[in-house]
Amino acid sequence: MTSDKNPYKTEQRMGAVKAVSGPVVIAENMGGSAMYELVQVGSFRLVGEIIRLEGDTATIQVYEETGGLTVGDPVYCTGKPLSLELGPGIMSEIFDGIQRPLDTIYRMVENVFIPRGVQVKSLNDQKQWDFKPCLKVGDLVSGGDIIGSVVENSLMYNHSIMIPPNVRGRVTSIVPSGNYTLQDDIIELEYNGTVKSLKLMHRWPVRTPRPVASKESGNHPLLTGQRVLDALFPSVQGGTCAIPGAFGCGKTVISQALSKFSNSDAVIYVGCGERGNEMAEVLMDFPTLTTVIDGREESIMKRTCLVANTSNMPVAAREASIYTGITLAEYYRDMGKHIAMMADSTSRWAEALREISGRLAEMPADGGYPAYLSARLASFYERAGRVTCIGGPKREGSVTIVGAVSPPGGDFSDPVTSATLGIVQVFWGLEKRLAQRKHFPSVNWLISYSKYLNALEPFFNTLDPDYMRLRSVAAEILQREEELQEIVQLVGKDSLSESDKIILETAKVIREEFLQQNAFTPYDKYCPPYKTCWMLRNIVAFYEESQRVVAESAGELKITWNYIREMIPHIYTGLTEMKFRDPQEGEEANVEFYRKQNEEIVSAFASLLQ
């Protein structure tokens, strides 16, 4: 993480190590240092960040293993905060928590472990990019204005090169179209007599949110391709979601489904303190996964950036990895793209805060976590949202944050979970009981919620004017089933009224055929909105028609649930086969199939009454 200028200049400020406690180092003679300034500790020049200042003593959290540091070792000040290199070449790259490219380090040292104090450029500054300018000499520009674009890869076709948010001036020279590296100056600006050159990349401090022109309200859904999420608990692009769940509930599978099938332009996946083998699985799986864009099959790595920070890496880097991920997401958002950021898992980040807080002898709060836990979580989640970007041309972008939470023993009253639930707008609660029954995605439909339903109503009404009613009927059936289960366990199913039997049977269809989804089949790994809508409509039509014929028949001609099952078994079986329609067959053919099925349901029940 070296600065653009040489950090080893002779007049560089230097302190000395006074005490070491795990990842926390106390240094003296640090007068003139700033909070969150980047420092290099010891002869290995380990990367660290100042987190407390008292007199001329600084407390530093070190992002690398501190074994071997001794009292009196030098501490070099860089005069800069922890910053990222932002430019073309981020997508399909794998970084660690402080944006060091793992692949480059592996090729450099030929060892699977990262050596301490390794200094390497975050982005490949030798690779040439095909740059097409869109400004001319004499133009007045300010932060966020688009200079031109490069083709990052076949999915990220238009990577906009922007003026950094804190720069302005008049264009005095700009390069013509052609191939340039990240080292080349591509534009010169003059402001108040000072000339500044800009490259294809710029640096931005991770703890500072990138400025926006205005925040907008989200009104377009984040489509995940998972029916239970899209139909019952939808999120908006620019929303905040939490996925709490115990070990083995399928958090990572939902995260991967979002990466593969969500309607985002790019995905930033942060593995924060996860097990090494889980992260290895993601690193091995993602390059082999493909998505179909405009009829072409492309690797999803082309629109994904991985920030890998496993549980055996130093704890301090977990906090950095979360901020690294959100800063990368904001950079792509400023181009006018819709970005999904997965943080897996925020509990491990909170544990890192707890450990460092303990070493700083701060007063612990609930569960040993520091008192500022919820403030830190809030400042992270607040960086999500749909925004109008600064600069011209006018464009809108969004960052959606999906944070996985791993409460110990699946206990949702854990301080991290409760703090997260006070902040996020969508809660997808995973349940161990459902996962053990092999019901995936194991989202508990009784405790999960979304506060975006009203905001998304206009979108769903364009999909189907009746959609919101169908959704609430389905949710009501599932709620009633839960109440009836207690009665069934006491006195058996036969004692229920015919109306209640219909509720139980319909709920079973909703649970097993609609909410359950197999991520490993071609027909069910992704469910487009029209298929979700028609499946829901046909199930609700069956339920409402059943209730109607039972209510309208009377006396000796009273129609029972068993009679319905015997007389029109093909209709009931048809409901269980709806999900086997492959979206590859095309929307028109599938909609026609579901429409015919809907007509069959209505006519079959009409014939029952006759």
From Swiss-Prot:
GO terms for molecular function: ATP binding; ATP hydrolysis activity; proton-transporting ATPase activity, rotational mechanism. ATP binds at residues 245-252. InterPro entries: ATP-synt_VA_C, ATP-synth_a_Xtn, ATP_synth_asu-like_sf, ATPase_a/bsu_AS, ATPase_F1/V1/A1_a/bsu_N, ATPase_F1/V1/A1_a/bsu_N_sf, ATPase_F1/V1/A1_a/bsu_nucl-bd, ATPase_F1/V1_b/a_C. It comes from the Eukaryota. Keywords: ATP-binding, Hydrogen ion transport, Ion transport, Nucleotide-binding, Translocase, Transport. One of its GO terms (cellular component) is proton-transporting V-type ATPase, V1 domain. It catalyses: ATP + H2O + 4 H(+)(in) = ADP + phosphate + 5 H(+)(out). Its EC number is 7.1.2.2. PROSITE patterns: ATPASE_ALPHA_BETA. GO terms for biological process: ATP metabolic process. V-ATPase is a heteromultimeric enzyme composed of a peripheral catalytic V1 complex (main components: subunits A, B, C, D, E, and F) attached to an integral membrane V0 proton pore complex (main component: the proteolipid protein). Catalytic subunit of the peripheral V1 complex of vacuolar ATPase. V-ATPase vacuolar ATPase is responsible for acidifying a variety of intracellular compartments in eukaryotic cells. Belongs to the ATPase alpha/beta chains family. This is V-type proton ATPase catalytic subunit A.
